[in-house]
Amino acid sequence: MNGRNNDMGRNGGADYDDRDFGRTPDLNADAPGRRRTGRKRVCRYCADKALVIDYKDPQALKYFISERGKVVPRRISGNCARHQRKVTLSIKRARNIALLPFTVTA
């Protein structure tokens, strides 16, 4: 017959379940589509009006750069959209005048 090994049975291999491969079903998983909501992060620049986003201050901008050299997203940094745009622009300006590196070497 067609040269194929027909050992899978009639179900096309559906005779297996998760226990056959050492995987156990996650009984504590949340319902599908439900997200965990943590505490709302407050934008540090909205909370303290004295703080200024300045591209000439690389120590303040390093907080918003990941270990790999990428800009940290809003959901992690806690910035509002307005200040996240300003932080991103400041990081780009600081990189262009060599105050911050474009890449991080390991």
UniProtKB/Swiss-Prot annotation:
It holds the Pfam family Ribosomal_S18. The keyword RNA-binding applies. Residues 1-39 are annotated as: Disordered. It comes from the Bacteria. One of its GO terms (biological process) is translation. One of its GO terms (cellular component) is cytosolic small ribosomal subunit. The keyword rRNA-binding applies. Gene3D superfamilies: Ribosomal protein S18 (4.10.640.10). InterPro entries: Ribosomal_bS18, Ribosomal_bS18_CS, Ribosomal_bS18_sf. GO terms for molecular function: small ribosomal subunit rRNA binding; structural constituent of ribosome. Keywords: Ribonucleoprotein, Ribosomal protein, RNA-binding, rRNA-binding. Binds as a heterodimer with protein bS6 to the central domain of the 16S rRNA, where it helps stabilize the platform of the 30S subunit. PANTHER family: 30S RIBOSOMAL PROTEIN S18 (PTHR13479), SMALL RIBOSOMAL SUBUNIT PROTEIN BS18M (PTHR13479:SF40). Part of the 30S ribosomal subunit. Forms a tight heterodimer with protein bS6. Belongs to the bacterial ribosomal protein bS18 family. This is Small ribosomal subunit protein bS18.
